[in-house]
Amino acid sequence: MATKINDDILSTPGKKTSVGDILKPLNSEYGKVAPGWGTTVLMGVFMALFAVFLVIILEIYNASVLLDGIPVSWNSLS
């Protein structure tokens, strides 16, 4: 057998620390999942809007989008 499970290690309760006591309330909702989709759709909408924003910024940076009346060169800024 390549691996062996040590039952003594699995049954020990672990070490109690002050950091663990502080972080315990954050883990109190473990395993509780709200039914339904929740805010998943809203998250998807914001992800799509952010992706569109990144594409627009990338196209402006690459100068593949030429805006009418707005020069894209650094020389025009001086």
Swiss-Prot record:
TM segment ranges: 41-61
Subcellular localization, as worded in the UniProt entry: Plastid, Chloroplast thylakoid membrane
Gene3D superfamilies: Photosystem II reaction center protein H
Record-linked InterPro entries: PSII_PsbH, PSII_PsbH_sf
Free-text function comment from the UniProt entry: One of the components of the core complex of photosystem II (PSII), required for its stability and/or assembly. PSII is a light-driven water:plastoquinone oxidoreductase that uses light energy to abstract electrons from H(2)O, generating O(2) and a proton gradient subsequently used for ATP formation. It consists of a core antenna complex that captures photons, and an electron transfer chain that converts photonic excitation into a charge separation.
Quaternary structure (record): PSII is composed of 1 copy each of membrane proteins PsbA, PsbB, PsbC, PsbD, PsbE, PsbF, PsbH, PsbI, PsbJ, PsbK, PsbL, PsbM, PsbT, PsbX, PsbY, PsbZ, Psb30/Ycf12, at least 3 peripheral proteins of the oxygen-evolving complex and a large number of cofactors. It forms dimeric complexes.
Protein name (database record): Photosystem II reaction center protein H
Organism: Spirogyra maxima
Lineage, uppermost ranks: Eukaryota, Viridiplantae, Streptophyta, Zygnematophyceae, Zygnematophycidae
